[in-house]
Amino acid sequence: MTLRFWFRRKAVILLQDKIPLLILLSVGAAFTAVWLALLRKRLNMAWYVAIMIAIAHTVYGVLTVKAFAFLETGFDKASLGNMSLFGGMFLMPLAYWLGAKISKRPPKEVFDVFTPCMVFTVMCARVNCILSGCCCGLPIPGTNGIRFPTREAEIVFYLILLAVLCPRIWKERLQGRAYPVYMMCYGAFRFIIEFFRESDISGLFHRAHLWALITLLLGVSIYAEMKTSKSKPRRRKQS
C-alpha cells in the first residue's frame, strides 16, 4: 500500500510539473488546427483531417526537439528531459516532405502552409522555458543579477516573423520560400542571441552557434536555389 501511494504521489508531482507544457502544446496544436482549417483548400483536406494533422504535428514536434537534445549531448541519458529547438528546424521538414509525397500534394504548398505552424509551436516551447526557468540569459554586468532577456527577445522575434509570413502565405506570394526564409531569419537571430545566453559549454561560442550557422547557410542555399530555378527560362519542347 505504501509503495502504491509512493508511485501515485510521484505521478501526481510529474503531471503537475508538466501541466504548463501540456497547456502550451495544446495552444500550439489549436493554432495549427485553425490555420490548417483556414487553408484547407490549398492542400485539399477536410477540416477534421486538419485537426488530426495538428495533433500529430505537435506530437512529432515534441519528439524531434527531445531526440535532437539527446543526440547533441552524445546520447547522455541525463539529457532525456531536455529540448533543443533545432531538432524541429532540421527534422520537421522530413515530415513535411514525406507528407507531401505520400499525399501527392505540392511540396511548396505544404512547406508554405506548415511554416507558421512550426514557428508558433517553437514559440510556445520558448514560453515554457520562461515558466520552467531554463535557457536563461547571461547576467548583465553592473545590474546586480538582472539577466539579458534572451527568451523574451526570441518570443518577440517569433511574433514579428509570424506577422510578416502569415499574410504573404495567405496571399500565396512566397511560392515555397517560407521555410528557407524562416531558416535564414532564425539562424541569424540565434547566432547573435547565443552570445547573451547561458550555456553548459565555457567560452564565447556555444554548441548552438554551430547549429544556428548551419541553419542560416542551409536557408540561404535553399532560398538562392529556388530563386535561381524560378528565374531560369523554361525550354520549349521541340516537336
What are these regions (language model features)?
Residues 2-239:
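Hydrophobic, membrane-interfacing alpha helices
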